[in-house]
Amino acid sequence: MKDEICIFCKLANGDIPTATVYEDEYLRAIMDAAPANKGHIIILPKSHAANIYELEDEYVSRAFVLAKKLAVALKKLTGCDDVNILQNNGGAAGQTVFHFHVHVIPRFKDDDCTIVWKPTSYEDGEASEVAKKIAELL
């Protein structure tokens, strides 16, 4: 269902004009208005969900299948070296618009776009223990 005050719902459902790359009954992919690099695309579900936790699995699957197709198209069109496919869930993860969306960003070896974190490490056996606990929750 569409949220009447959500800007991304309005973009996804055509209430605000956009440069649309792709559209079907579930999704709209548009050019990002403030791109990290030229060719930066945002995939938006037409149904409102704040994050991946709320989004129906079919929408998640369709969004990431489309992300792959867009990545291939961007490499052909832009000649980019690689592509980032990004999706943030919640403020602590960097989400700023609370409507699920996927960024598809063409990357070039010498561009100014950075995605950085400070690596940490596990104690001996800790990774296996965490993996087991996650698997139990699936």
Residues covered by each model-derived region:
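HIT superfamily nucleotide-processing domains
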Residues: M1-L138
